[in-house]
From Swiss-Prot:
Protein name: Putative acyl carrier protein phosphodiesterase
Catalytically driven reaction(s): holo-[ACP] + H2O = apo-[ACP] + (R)-4'-phosphopantetheine + H(+)
Source taxonomy: Bacteria, Pseudomonadati, Pseudomonadota, Gammaproteobacteria, Enterobacterales
Protein family according to the UniProt entry: Belongs to the AcpH family.
Enzyme's top EC category: hydrolase
UniProt entry keywords in alphabetical sequence: Fatty acid biosynthesis, Fatty acid metabolism, Hydrolase, Lipid biosynthesis, Lipid metabolism
Role played: Converts holo-ACP to apo-ACP by hydrolytic cleavage of the phosphopantetheine prosthetic group from ACP.
Pfam families cross-referenced by the UniProt entry: ACP_PD
Source species of the chain: Shigella dysenteriae serotype 1 (strain Sd197)
Length: 143
């Protein structure tokens, strides 16, 4: 959803040549980090923990008919509170390493952590530029 936004296209260029191929995946994880980190500002009337409970209830209704890999992912996602823990950059590094471990073709995700760390402030600025606009588009059903 965010890949074609100008701020995201710009941020992809900040990745080194050896990690640029996985930049879209890494950036998606990073946007989730900022969303979790700034949740109370972005959604003051719906605390993150309440949202997590609501989202889990919604997903649980479709889980019985889902693929085993999706079911397995959800077992970890909810029990380990991933959406809450995304605010912690050490957890983001673990997430990227885990993805790389499961998919050898995505091994560059391990090193993409350094790109995130090097450009953290600029990435956060880009998040604040595109997120309100993206949410307005969602509200208008224009995205």
């Amino acid at each position: 959803m965010t890949d074609n936004l100008p701020e995201v296209r710009e941020a992809r260029e900040w990745f080194r040549s050896e990690t640029r191929r996985v930049a879209p995946i890494t950036l998606d994880v990073m946007w989730d980090h900022f969303l979790s980190r700034h949740w109370s500002q972005l959604s003051p009337d719906f605390p993150l923990q309440e949202f997590v409970c609501y989202a889990r209830e919604q997903v649980m209704t479709i889980l019985p008919d889902s693929l085993p890999r999706f079911i397995n992912l959800n077992n970890y996602l909810w029990s380990e509170q991933w959406l809450v823990r995304y605010r912690d950059m050490d957890f983001i590094q673990n997430v990227l390493n885990g993805m790389a471990s499961r998919r050898p073709r995505l091994d560059a995700l391990r090193d993409s952590w350094y790109d995130l760390n090097a450009h953290y402030a600029a990435l956060e600025t880009r998040f604040w530029q595109f997120y309100p606009r993206m949410m307005a588009q969602v509200s208008r059903k224009a995205l």
